Every structure is written in structure tokens, then in C-alpha cells.
Amino acid sequence: MVRLAHAGLYTQGADMIHHGDVRTILPTLKAGSVQCVVTSPPYWGLRDYGVTGQIGLEPTPEAYVENMVQVFREVKRVLRDDGTVWLNLGDSYNSTSGFSRANKQWARKGRDGGANDKKEIKHPTLKTKDLIGIPWRVAFALQADGWYLRSDIVWHKPNPMPESVTDRPTKSHEYLFLLTKSVQYYYDAEAVREPAQDSKSGRNLRSVWTINPKPYA
């Protein structure tokens, strides 16, 4: 795996990597030039990457959602009419404990945090300890902006990041949304069929995926 330290364009044979802020890179791509988008944007309020104006440190959930809507308008422009978007998002809580930081061992191994605490904000509807519901806020906002919300997939994590909580279950899942810009789009159901005891041809892919988080290479 090549780690890119600076923004820029990197090529190797037919492969091309654009490295930079999505809000800067996407406008440089041709309309309708992308078949599939797989993305996990910065989760709201859970990590500071030390970049001015970064996505994820907006003052309110609404501001974060609006930024996501704006970014995905540009995603829609570059996406082919038969293309798909697979969007992974985690959640956070409104908490008085400040920003939650991942356990160093897990952070060093590149593990993703689940629904962690967010510094408490003054909000007309969010109360202390409320689960904010960021993934669904974004999904519904994109739906309202014209995207087809085709599927919600639960990413089940058998080895989630530990949480020091005693008044709720430990978070062990995140969401993955399948979004399209058209009613008809390319989706190869046969390529992802699951084994089934009662059928030699298998069964249609289910919407709960059990995948262990793995360390970065």
C-alpha cells in the first residue's frame, strides 16, 4: 500500500489516484465518468485531522448534513446514469464528556470507532446522551435531494472498538447505504450470491454483512 503524504495526481500504468480534498478534486472530473463510488466520509465530530475547513467538525449535525448534500451533488454529476454509490457512515452521541478518543491500541491498528461521544452541543432537539442518528440524517437528506435510497446494509463488527459504557449496549455495527441517481442501474446480483443449503445456485445477497475490522497494511 502506498501512503500519499501530499495532495496530487499519481499514476501507474492504467491506474490513477487523485489525492486531495473531494471538494477540490471532484470538479476536475468529467461528468458521467464514474461507474461506482465507494466512500466513507469523515464521521461527524469524532476525529480532528488537523485540516482547516475539514468535513466532520461542523458545529451542528445540520451543517454536516448540508456539507454532505453539497458534496454528493458533485458526486451525482460525475456518476454515470447507471452508476451506484456505496456510502458508509458511523454515528455519534451528544455528550458532556467531550470528544471521545479511540483506545491507542485500536487507533494504531487502524480500527474504526463505532458510535462515540461527541462534545455536547446546544441544540433545540438533541438532549445529553442522545444518539444523533447521523447516518440516517444524511441518507434522508440525499433522498430528498433526488438520490434513490435503494438499500440500507448493516455492517456487523464481531470485534468492535471497546466502549466504557454501562447504560447502553456497546456499538457493534455501522451503516452502508446503496444510492443511485436513476431508477435503472448496473447491479450484478449473480456475482454476489451467497451460499444456501437449499439451493445450489445460492441466494440473493442479504443486508447484514459480518466483517471484522482489520489493521491498515
What are the residue ranges of the model-derived segments?
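Core catalytic lobe of class I
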Residues: 1-217
